[in-house]
Amino acid sequence: MGTNLSVPNPLGFFPDHQLDPAFKANSENPDWDLNPNKDNWPDANKVGVGAFGPGFTPPHGGLLGWSPQAQGLLTTVPAAPPPASTNRQSGRQPTPLSPPLRDTHPQAMQWNSTTFHQTLQDPGVRALYFPAGGSSSGTVSPAQNTVSAISSILSKTGDPVPNMENIASGLLGPLLVLQAGFFLLTKILTIPQSLDSWWTSLNFLGGTPVCLGQNSQSQISSHSPTCCPPICPGYRWMCLRRFIIFLCILLLCLIFLLVLLDYQGMLPVCPLIPGSSTTSTGPCKTCTTPAQGTSMFPSCCCTKPTDGNCTCIPIPSSWAFAKYLWEWASVRFSWLSLLVPFVQWFVGLSPTVWLSVIWMIWFWGPSLYNILSPFMPLLPIFFCLWVYI
């Protein structure tokens, strides 16, 4: 098959075949299959630069002849020597003067002895200079000085290296707060159901609570009144009970917040001035004296009658709103003033008060715990508000 001239091979890409332009052999153009200058098979895949441009030269020679350029062979031409220099000076020229350090490295000018000693107080940098257990009078290694100075300069000029310990501690706090908040949220969501169970248990003292909305004709199985399905007639009553419970919880939170703000002195309510009216038609009260220090709350309230002098009463720094409510209730209900001596006497008997409290806790403790246990998740929230507000 190697001498079969009937097999066309236009560009010579098949191994062991060359293109015969006349499709016959003669003395000037021998059979190309017998050409001793042809390439072997591994060389046929080589990409050359020649007659057809980069990578387009046929591997066995182009159609333009057997010249080196046609076959993609490059001839190295020696470069012409440079012309003789006309400069009379020969040899190495002197090195030019370097620009000042303050122009090339301005950050290095900030590194003076004061900054060096301040940085030396850092425990991390101090460990590079003095060995463990050594003193400041020890020998300082030059290599450590160089590294410390360069690292300190780079720390001033380059980007700071992030401290993974600070990043981890910074992320740990929000994650713990998120976990605690989610835990409290799940517990708070159980408060309405627990209070609903306690509410319905009051109707079944000593027995198992059973929904009263089901009857013999309904297809609803026996269930608790706190878990009524939507098709049960008692479902609407369960929703009403839980809505009332939510309102009570919201009211409890608002009362606690009001008490906390009043205790902190953030409710500067003007007390009732003796002899003044409690209605809106009474004398106009205006706070004229600012509070002591930098507080924005006033310290006293004044009223000025049309035919008299100005009367000012100081505002309590704490429990101002509570005292205002007590004064208002004492004006409306005169019998409350009779309880003041009794309360003062009872508070003055501290041993008796403590014994009474201990006895009440011992006697009513278990039942009070069953009643107050649903409100336990609210205690951490109240505690955080009390501490941080």
UniProtKB/Swiss-Prot annotation:
Query: Lipidation annotated as N-myristoyl glycine: which positions?
Result: 2
Q: Which residues point to the Intravirion side?
A: 2-242, 192-242, 359-364
- Show the GO cellular component annotation of the record: membrane; viral envelope; virion membrane
Which residue intervals make up region (Pre-S2)?
A: 109-163
**Cited InterPro entries:** HBV_HBSAG
**Region ranges (Pre-S1):** 2-108
Give the Virion surface compartment stretches of this protein.
2-170, 264-337, 388-389
Q: Where is the composition biased (Polar residues)?
A: 85-95
Which residues carry a glycan? Answer: 309
| PTM field | Isoform M is N-terminally acetylated by host at a ratio of 90%, and N-glycosylated by host at the pre-S2 region.
A Pfam family cross-referenced in the UniProt record is vMSA
Q: Where are the transmembrane segments?
A: 171-191, 243-263, 338-358, 365-387
Keywords for this protein:
Acetylation, Caveolin-mediated endocytosis of virus by host, Fusion of virus membrane with host endosomal membrane, Fusion of virus membrane with host membrane, Glycoprotein, Host-virus interaction, Lipoprotein, Membrane, Myristate, Transmembrane, Transmembrane helix, Viral attachment to host cell, Viral envelope protein, Viral penetration into host cytoplasm, Virion, Virus endocytosis by host, Virus entry into host cell
A GO BP entry is:
caveolin-mediated endocytosis of virus by host cell
| Region Pre-S: start-end pairs | 2-163
Extract the ranges annotated as region (Disordered).
74-103
| Biotechnological applications listed in the UniProt record | Systematic vaccination of individuals at risk of exposure to the virus has been the main method of controlling the morbidity and mortality associated with hepatitis B. The first hepatitis B vaccine was manufactured by the purification and inactivation of HBsAg obtained from the plasma of chronic hepatitis B virus carriers. The vaccine is now produced by recombinant DNA techniques and expression of the S isoform in yeast cells. The pre-S region do not seem to induce strong enough antigenic response.
Entry keyword annotation includes Transmembrane helix:
yes
Looking at the keywords, is Hydrolase present? no
Q: Where in the cell is it found?
A: Virion membrane
The record's comment about this protein's domains reads: The large envelope protein is synthesized with the pre-S region at the cytosolic side of the endoplasmic reticulum and, hence will be within the virion after budding. Therefore the pre-S region is not N-glycosylated. Later a post-translational translocation of N-terminal pre-S and TM1 domains occur in about 50% of proteins at the virion surface. These molecules change their topology by an unknown mechanism, resulting in exposure of pre-S region at virion surface.
User: Tell me, how does this one assemble?
Assistant: Interacts (via its myristoylated pre-S1 region) with the host SLC10A1/NTCP; this interaction is essential for viral entry.
Task: Tell me the protein family, please.
Answer: Belongs to the orthohepadnavirus major surface antigen family.
Role this protein plays:
The large envelope protein exists in two topological conformations, one which is termed 'external' or Le-HBsAg and the other 'internal' or Li-HBsAg. In its external conformation the protein attaches the virus to cell receptors and thereby initiating infection. This interaction determines the species specificity and liver tropism. This attachment induces virion internalization predominantly through caveolin-mediated endocytosis. The large envelope protein also assures fusion between virion membrane and endosomal membrane. The middle envelope protein plays an important role in the budding of the virion. It is involved in the induction of budding in a nucleocapsid independent way. In this process the majority of envelope proteins bud to form subviral lipoprotein particles of 22 nm of diameter that do not contain a nucleocapsid.
Q: What is this protein called?
A: Large envelope protein
What species is this protein from?
Hepatitis B virus genotype B/C subtype adw (isolate Okinawa/pODW282/1998)
